[in-house]
Each structure stands twice: as C-alpha cells, then as structure tokens.
C-alpha cells in the first residue's frame, strides 16, 4: 500500500534490538531536515538554533523544553557538494565539508554532552552523520557507498529511492517507507516522504 511503513530485520539479529529509541517525532525530523537546506536555517518550534555553533551545512538545535539537542547535517545542494559526494564514493573524507561538519559536531558534544544529542542527516548528510558521530543517529535515504554501519543508528529509507538502494546492508534499526515508482527520482528521495510516518515517535 502506498505510504505504508515496514520495519526490516537484518543479519545482525539481536544486535539490531540494541539500537536505542531516539526520542524524536518523525514530523520534527522531517521539518529539521528540510530546514537544513534553507539558505539561512532558522528556529523550528521549540527547537532554537544555536547560532554560535551552526553553519550553512550543519546546524545545532536546542529544545529548552525537553533539553534535547539536534545536530542536522545537510545533504547535497550544489556543485561543490557533488564533488564531496564523489570523494565519499571512494571513501575519502579529506575535504573541507567533512572537516567543518566534524568541528561543529565536536563542539556541540563538548557543549551539550554526546548523550543529549541526536545527530540527523539526509542523503549526503546521512553519510556525514555516520562519520562524525558514534552517538544516536537518524539517517534518511542515505546512500551506502562504504562501510558506515552504526548500531546506534536508525536508518529510514523510502522504497524505490534510487540513491539509497543498497542501504539494506546497514546495521542498526531500519524503517522503510513504502512508496510507488515515480518517474521523477527526486520525488522518492525527498524529505516530504517522512510525513507518511504520521508523526511516529522514533
């Protein structure tokens, strides 16, 4: 059925059960990932952006109500990021995009504590999330082009998304959002599809 969600198992068996509950609603994930593509990312509801740490490609949000902190890594946007995609394809993290993301991640963990942070990323941002953090992670439609498994990761993907076809080999917890075939490949890759989870607690 269109929009149905499906939880997959993997070869790791019991290890998949060790993946922690993330403590974040899917609607919040959708909006924060979408906002990461804005030219000037801004606050979202109770999530206030930490301007002292945030940049254009990675943002740090603090929820003063819950105490939760979100670090969001943006996906591909522009020719420069396409070059980064190509570098990641060969397992090369020696680039300014990665260095800046790692710096922001380290500063956020030093300021707020790693246990209080959920790191999220869409597409290329998901790959970066895997590489800069070993804490709680939520990745969405992340292309898996090298070994980037993490037992603390919730990997969400949309069926028929051409950019994350081989992410089924990932460890951790998985959610697949069932989606019909679309002639526009970017439709199934879009963060809009997360809305089909109906504000599920992740």
Question: Language-model features: where?
Answer:
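Gly/Ala-rich beta-loop-alpha elbow adjacent to hydrolase catalytic centers
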Residues: 120-125, 129
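Active-site-proximal beta-strand/loop segments in catalytic clefts of secreted hydrolases
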Residues: 73-76, 122-123, 140-143, 159
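Short amphipathic alpha-helical segments and helix-helix/interface helices
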Residues: 105, 129-130
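Serine hydrolase/lipase
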Residues: 5, 11, 15, 65-68, ...
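A conserved cap/lid and substrate-binding interface adjacent to the catalytic center
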Residues: 15-16, 21-118, 136, 148-152, ...
């Amino acid at each position: 059925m269109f929009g149905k969600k499906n939880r997959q198992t993997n070869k790791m068996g019991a290890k998949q059960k060790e993946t922690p509950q993330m403590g974040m609603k899917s609607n919040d994930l959708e909006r924060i990932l979408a906002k990461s593509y804005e030219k000037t990312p801004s606050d979202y509801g109770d999530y206030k952006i930490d301007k002292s740490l945030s940049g254009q490609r990675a943002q740090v949000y603090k929820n003063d109500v819950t105490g939760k902190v979100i670090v969001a890594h943006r996906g591909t946007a522009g020719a420069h990021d396409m070059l980064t995609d190509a570098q990641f394809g060969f397992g090369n993290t020696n680039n300014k995009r990665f260095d800046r993301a790692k710096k922001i991640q380290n500063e956020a963990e030093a300021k707020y504590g790693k246990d209080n942070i959920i790191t999220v990323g869409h597409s290329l941002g998901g790959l970066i999330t895997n590489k800069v953090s070993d804490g709680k992670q939520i990745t969405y439609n992340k292309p898996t082009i090298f070994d980037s498994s993490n037992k603390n990761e919730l990997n969400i993907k949309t069926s028929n998304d051409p950019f994350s076809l081989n992410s089924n080999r990932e460890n951790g917890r998985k959610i697949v959002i069932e989606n019909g075939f679309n002639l526009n490949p970017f439709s199934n890759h879009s963060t809009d599809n997360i809305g089909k989870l109906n504000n599920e607690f992740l």
